[in-house]
Amino acid sequence: MYEKFGQFINGKWQQSSDKGTYEVINPANEEIIGHASKATSIDVEAALKSAAKGLEIWKKTAPWQRSYIIRRIADKIREKQDILAKWMTLEVGKPLAEAKGEIGGAADIFEWNAEETKRIYGQTVESLSLIHI
């Protein structure tokens, strides 16, 4: 199995601006399983610009539409759970059953967020954590 992975920027898959790649290696056997596109500062700038544009659209999206979109993401994750888990296993060496659980957990988080978009109360709750991302 050998794959080429691009960058998803502004709604489409593409190579990096300088066509650079790096090897994706299976840590269990050190086999090359693919090549991923190596982002340049130009690519990062394009991604940030696209994200800023997307945020302006998302801000104007009705809560029920946001919920629908986020739920579809959860559905797609579940639909592709087996292949995503397989790739996770190859890329990070995680046991397949554990990878499937992690992928399922990601879908659960999207489902939870889909429901939360329906509950907009106009309040902000501060994090108790001192670690901010």
Please describe what each predicted stretch is.
Residues 131-133:
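Conserved small/polar residues in nucleotide/adenosyl-binding loops
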